[in-house]
Swiss-Prot record:
Gene Ontology process terms (BP): mRNA splicing, via spliceosome
Family matches, as NCBIfam families: PRK00737.1
HAMAP family to which the protein is assigned, alphabetical: Lsm_RuxX
Keyword terms, alphabetized: Ribonucleoprotein
SUPFAM superfamilies per record: Sm-like ribonucleoproteins (SSF50182)
Gene Ontology molecular function: RNA binding
Organism: Thermococcus sibiricus (strain DSM 12597 / MM 739)
Domain Sm: 4-76
Family: Belongs to the snRNP Sm proteins family.
Protein name: Putative snRNP Sm-like protein
């Protein structure tokens, strides 16, 4: 049986994710919360530009309307 999108997000709780926004901004951090509207809460969030951290934040909330994609980050 195929996984549903929210199942993948749920499995990513307390793990590092990359959130890509509609206007192209990217944030990486530990996913500590989400809801059915894809509002997400990241801890230890970083704004990513050109693949590199540009600015660090503590905890941030990203409104689901702005989210284009949420991807688990593979830690090597």
């Amino acid at each position: 049986m195929a996984e549903r999108p929210l199942d993948v997000i749920h499995k990513s709780l307390d793990k590092e994710v990359l959130v890509i926004l509609k206007r192209g901004a990217e944030y990486r951090g530990k996913l500590i919360g989400y809801d059915i509207h894809l509002n997400v809460v990241l801890a230890d969030a970083q704004l990513i530009e050109n693949g590199e951290p540009k600015k660090s934040y503590g905890k941030i909330v990203i409104r689901g309307d702005n989210v284009l994609a949420i991807s688990p980050v593979e830690i090597e």
